């Protein structure tokens, strides 16, 4: 009799399709929320990934893709999606002054108002658990009083002329300040149907819209009469002269527009950006090359020493030399920042006692760069040492025995046997180390923050900045505003450079492009 394989209740098709249906509803709800809030890219990305995932995990024909999909989805979400967004931003003027859409920027300008008409002194009187608003005309001395009301939301209060103000102590400035948000939502309607709103902590006054919008999109300042027109080239409402030409005045906030290759051309044409960019690029390459050379050299020499058979206590030395690799890098960097302190650091105290010198590690460009390379060598040599220790085990002892018979010494063995045999397998790892240090943001940010700063530059730039930290400072530390578009353009250039390094790495390891 054939054994019938029983299925558990959680393996039933009805439950499976019910769960899939609930997930579809949840994803649809999230996509609608994102779309309603204007997050169109996130909505599209969520819809695509979720739809593909539901299809793969609910269709038996796509069973093999279940093992690949999580990796592909992660790459798409965390690599391709940010990359596409960064490249897209690079072709816009997106910045701290141009963050809004045109419609939103226009609405912000239309919501602005200015004081027009009489100003009335106001007082707030308690009426049980409610309040009464009293306005006083400073010119005529007339008083106007509202009915009792409670704070909460936008309200229109009808005021009537009163012979005298309510008895009792009126609210002090502290109470008014605490309820300022609620008072700003009140509109007081006087007996002549004129409306006034809170204009200061002591006054209500009539207001009018600052700008009037025409059918052609032109804004007119109701106070000065100046006309403004949207300039799609710069993303601002800009004043226009009598002859129709552009004036010098711009209205903030601006709005985001596509500006083509302008951010990229700024990198190569604006001297305030071009000079620091190329100087920082050269320093980034030099820093990466020196770091790789020094870490490999120190790591290889130490690996040879701890592998020396005549050395006693090799295990202890190995542990001690690998310790810098075990300590989190950000902790080591901050410790070195204290050690290199120009006034109280132990390194300067020692150099002063021995040689009578106190290098300016953080204010002189040359010594600051030297300090960066020293610290990065300390952080990177244990990794190279571990690699070399493993590779040394693969070198046959027969080679050293044959060289000893020929009368070769330790230095000849190192340069004629050890170094050539280690460099070849280390080459792809050295290229990977170069690419990593090309974007070593943490070291620069924690140790020097890019300083000392360069003078006469359009964008914030320092002598120890790498391209990645330079991009970060443009995006988030710009004194004249955060220029995300320019930062995205530089980030795109960095991506192309790192991509070129990846191709070099592939060619160096003789991998074929399938």
UniProtKB/Swiss-Prot annotation:
Gene Ontology terms: biological process: maltodextrin transmembrane transport
InterPro entries linked to this entry: MalF_N, MalF_N_TM, MalF_P2, MalF_P2_sf, MetI-like, MetI-like_sf
Transmembrane region(s): 13-35, 40-57, 70-92, 284-306, 319-341, 370-392, 413-435, 484-506
ABC transmembrane type-1 domain span: 281-505
Membrane topology, from the record: Multi-pass membrane protein
Intervals, Cytoplasmic compartment: 1-12, 58-69, 307-318, 393-412, 507-514
Localisation per UniProt entry: Cell inner membrane
One GO CC term on file: maltose transport complex
UniProt entry tagged with the keyword Cell membrane: yes
GO molecular function, one term: ABC-type maltose transporter activity
Keywords: Cell inner membrane, Cell membrane, Membrane, Sugar transport, Transmembrane, Transmembrane helix, Transport
Signal peptide annotation: none
Periplasmic side: 36-39, 93-283, 342-369, 436-483
Similarity annotation: Belongs to the binding-protein-dependent transport system permease family. MalFG subfamily.
Function description: Part of the ABC transporter complex MalEFGK involved in maltose/maltodextrin import. Probably responsible for the translocation of the substrate across the membrane.
PANTHER family noted in UniProt: MALTOSE/MALTODEXTRIN TRANSPORT SYSTEM PERMEASE PROTEIN MALF, MALTOSE_MALTODEXTRIN TRANSPORT SYSTEM PERMEASE PROTEIN MALF
Subunit details: The complex is composed of two ATP-binding proteins (MalK), two transmembrane proteins (MalG and MalF) and a solute-binding protein (MalE).
Name of the protein in question: Maltose/maltodextrin transport system permease protein MalF
Species per Swiss-Prot/TrEMBL record: Klebsiella aerogenes (Enterobacter aerogenes)
